[in-house]
Amino acid sequence: MSHDVSVIGLYILDVLGRPVDAIPPGGNVEFIDEIRLTVAGTAGGTVVDLAKLGLNCLAVGAVGDDEKADFVLATLQRFGVDVAQMQRLKGVPTSSTILNIRRNGDRPALHARGASDHFEIADSALDAVLAPPIIHLGGTGLLAKLDGEPSRKLLAEAKARGRITTFDLLGANDGTLDLISPLFPHIDYFMPSIEEAKQISGAAD
């Protein structure tokens, strides 16, 4: 099967509640309007959106061996995403986030790291993973085994094969620029948020 895009990186389960004005004190209960489960992450959310737009997508990432993984994989398949390169890892949970969505749209997050920290790509998988013409890497900063030199080598190999490369991270801090700057020569399109761009560049505008 030929794919339009390979979407590599962070696949997580998001639990969204809205609107959340405050966490109730003690063991009290606060009623909200909606709770939803979604596939998220700067790879997971991206691949779902691309599939909705009609692209033939290959998902490349890792989930755990739990009920959260069942939901992530079933949802990807429901949208027609090829999950043949998704790794299901025993002994670790699927990475997941609780998002308390405020009325103004702010989304403070509680994240539990999991399978994405153990995700890596074997050399034997490169032909399949890098076969599509577009390669997206998303989630740098929360991909412990893939971050740094493995990501640089992956993107360099993608460019050596003539692929278009796109890149997104997840959050930014004082160490982010050092982490991602070796990747820049191998990235065609980098898509940080405004907040991430300010943090990385040190610019106010």
Give the predicted meaning of each segment.
Residues A69-D70, S95-S96, L177-D178:
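Short Asp/Glu-rich motifs
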Residues K90-V92:
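Short, glycine-/polar-rich solvent-exposed loops and beta-turns at beta-strand/coil boundaries
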Residues V48, S96-N100, P108:
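Short beta-strand scaffold segments in enzyme catalytic cores
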Residues M1-A62, E67-V81:
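Glycine-rich phosphate/adenosyl-contacting loop at the front of the ribokinase-like
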Residues M1-I12, A74-R88, I101-D205:
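Ribokinase/PfkB-type carbohydrate-kinase core domain
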